[in-house]
Amino acid sequence: MVKYIIKALVEVDGPVDEHDIIGAIFGQTEGLLDDFDLRELQEKGRIGRILVKLQRRGNKAVGEIYVPSNLDRVETALVAAMLESVDKVGPYPARISVVEIIDVRAEKIKKIIERAKEILKKWSQEKSVDIREILKEISETTKKSQLIEYGPEKLPAGPGVERSDTIIIVEGRADVLNLLRYGYDNVIALGGATTKVPETIKKLAKEKIAIAFVDGDRGGLMVLKNLLSQADIDYVARAPPGKEVEDLTAREIAKSLSNLIPASKMKEELLKVEKLQKEEVKEVAEKAEKVEAEEVVKKEEVAERGEEMESKAEGAEQPTATALEKAAAKEEVKQEVKTEEEKVKEYVMFIPDSVFEKAKEITGTLRSVLYDSQWNIVAEVPAKDVVSAIEEKGAYAVLHDGVITQRMLDVMSLKGGRLILGRRVARVSKRPKGVFVVLLS
């Protein structure tokens, strides 16, 4: 490492070149001091390469000489003095005068100190940044930079769809953005085509491992059925019950994708459900036919009695008409009851486990919990205040540790509510349509 640099000015009364001056320095200092022969010092690395910068001014040559030195301060000063002893370059008089010995380490330290001051000043001026702002900025950047349009249908997708050997198929653009936010770039959306699967999706599903990732509600099941019937899907992932893919956290996404169900198994499960539904419909139809047959028998009996009494009174056919009306009414009631039961089953299927855990928690406390359509808790109030809470805040579902009353059902219907979960129901004169009661065991 160079410790010092000797800087000297040179002036020669004649037209000389740089190598002439360097040769004169070595030649005229040789033999002056035995231990300070410049050639030997250079060979040992004690001094560096001598640099000369010249300019011509008429018949004169003027310039600067630089000699790097690894010697100590005293020895460097001695070399500097030796330079000044040179008084000729070739046949021309010359003058060399040392103007400065630069301490390289000191200069380096000086630069370090100045730079440290600049860094500290800049650092002091910068304000501390909120981590939430950083995360938001990164998130927004990810959204804007990574979302692409793929295929002739211009489907919302991530940049990894083309290069990855696995794709994740979701329903819409918002689902794609949410998965991109958490680093899943091999995602593509149906683009609103929930009934007819786009050709681009079909083609990708044939070429790659395809994962269908759908919402945890009835709509998600419908999308899944269409995908399984029209595209070559390998695995199925579902959001937690009652939740949509676009609202999931990183942990929920990872959990859903780690619990993949083979598409073949999911098809079997869906077929079983459809078979059970068909059997239930068949059973209801058979019961309705039985009721109808019984009423027809009654109708015939009434008709026979009517013929016998025809001479005594008019309108003998009225009982027949009444019997038919009753049969039709009974059949209609049975169908309505069955339809309501099916709807309740569908709603119960998508109630999160956390709600049932909450039901255990509030048992015996006479409290009520109001939920929105995403099963987020809107409010938790005493059971006696539940009606006013529904009127004020509205609710998709209510978990009620108390008696479910007519007033409660009416207010839920008025506010667009759908479910009431509880253990006891009071005498209800009229149950509003669209509001369903789930009795907990």
From Swiss-Prot:
Keywords for the protein's UniProt record, in alphabetical order: DNA replication, DNA-directed RNA polymerase, Exosome, Magnesium, Metal-binding, Nucleotidyltransferase, Primosome, Transcription, Transferase
Binding site for Mg(2+) 1: 171, 215
EC number: 2.7.7.101
Protein name, per record: DNA primase DnaG
Cystine pairings recorded for this chain: none
Biased composition regions of type Basic and acidic residues, renumbered to the chain: 299-315
Co-factor(s): Mg(2+)
UniProt record similarity statement: Belongs to the archaeal DnaG primase family.
GO cellular component, one term: exosome (RNase complex)
Entry-linked SMART domains: TOPRIM (SM00493)
Subunit structure: Forms a ternary complex with MCM helicase and DNA. Component of the archaeal exosome complex.
Organism encoding this protein: Ignicoccus hospitalis (strain KIN4/I / DSM 18386 / JCM 14125)
